[in-house]
Amino acid sequence: MKTGRYIGIMSGTSLDGIDVVLAAIDETLVAHQGHYVHPIPHEVKTAILAMSQGQETTLAAVGELDRTLGTLYAGAVNQLLQRQRLTAQDIVAIGCHGQTVWHQPDGSAPFTLQLGDNNRVAALTGIATVGDFRRRDMAYGGQGAPLVPAFHHALLAHPGERRMVLNIGGIANLSLLLPGAAVRGFDTGPGNMLMDAWIWRRCRRPYDANAAWACGGRVLSALLTQMLADPYFARPAPKSTGRELFNLAWLERQLQRWPGVDARDVQATLAELTARSIADQVQLAGGCERLLVCGGGVHNPLVMARMAALLPGTEVAPTDKYGVSADDMEALAFAWLAYRTLSGLPGNLPSVTGADRPTLLGAIYPVNPYDAGVAL
């Protein structure tokens, strides 16, 4: 087994920063040892949003963004190493998810595309890098997502409790950790994505701090019902989604019948959409004793309170309470997936993604033996 220190990199659909974590990993333990959040420049966010919402682009723009993200990821890793007083030689490998710009798991030509040149990550850090995790699962008929339920199961499953782990990033995804049953997981729908997009559109703020804006509005029941009628919510698992569906264009179509609506009421309704779509899926799966929450949405007190109200008898709590950082969960997961790949172990769960078999995930970008230090 390739035990030792790993670094995980995650930049999700919320675009709230590049999360970089340091972890010591072996067969039984993932020990969180440090983290750093690297800012994403405004012009890079703009380019990502343009591509991921289906705007016309060019191959040159795709290539330039791929290179830029690779450079940003490497810079984030080097910042973490400096802060932890470590060198590249102290790290076994980096697990780099990349930035999803399009995820199309269904139809006649399913594919997923994450940008962030891992050749540059390996070259600029001097550390072997594992990336492009999702496409191998899709090659075996899977959705390529979610991949984190395997990690949730390894760290948070309990033999005597019905537990579910909920990640609320831009998209929300749920892992079902039920005793005696195969692990299942899927995307429930929008997490922070629509709330963040709406407050940016109306207030030029990147997110609704403490849900203060949403709390100034009221839920529009008819609008909520209309939103929940989107076919995605009724689809059975395995399923996954992203910004290519739940984006501002989707929201604007929903609002066509509501001219002059108060913007705060829309925000309140979007918060309720996130909470309700999650709670509905928890109940459809038979409920649970504990719903353990991670991702940026754990800091939204309105969504957390509404989930607790919609799920009486269920403890709704951050994963921190059970020993795993809610903010660093996904980056830790990709460090762990890199460990799995280098150790010759499968990283996907066919019961989650729908793939027809377990498989190693990702491509390996090795250290260059001809580098005398890394100065590019």
From Swiss-Prot:
Top-level EC class: transferase
Keywords of this entry: ATP-binding, Carbohydrate metabolism, Kinase, Nucleotide-binding, Transferase
Pathway, per record: Amino-sugar metabolism; 1,6-anhydro-N-acetylmuramate degradation; Cell wall biogenesis; peptidoglycan recycling
Statement: the UniProt record of this protein carries the keyword ATP-binding: yes
InterPro entries, per the entry: Anhydro_N_Ac-Mur_kinase, ATPase_NBD
EC number: 2.7.1.170
Gene Ontology molecular function terms on file: ATP binding; kinase activity; phosphotransferase activity, alcohol group as acceptor
Transmembrane spans: none
SUPFAM superfamilies: Actin-like ATPase domain
GO biological process: 1,6-anhydro-N-acetyl-beta-muramic acid catabolic process; amino sugar metabolic process; peptidoglycan turnover
Catalytic reaction equation(s): 1,6-anhydro-N-acetyl-beta-muramate + ATP + H2O = N-acetyl-D-muramate 6-phosphate + ADP + H(+)
UniProt binding sites for ATP: G12, T13, S14, L15, D16, G17, I18, D19
UniProt function note: Catalyzes the specific phosphorylation of 1,6-anhydro-N-acetylmuramic acid (anhMurNAc) with the simultaneous cleavage of the 1,6-anhydro ring, generating MurNAc-6-P. Is required for the utilization of anhMurNAc either imported from the medium or derived from its own cell wall murein, and thus plays a role in cell wall recycling.
PANTHER family associated with the record: ANHYDRO-N-ACETYLMURAMIC ACID KINASE
Similarity section: Belongs to the anhydro-N-acetylmuramic acid kinase family.
Official protein name in the record: Anhydro-N-acetylmuramic acid kinase
Organism: Edwardsiella ictaluri (strain 93-146)
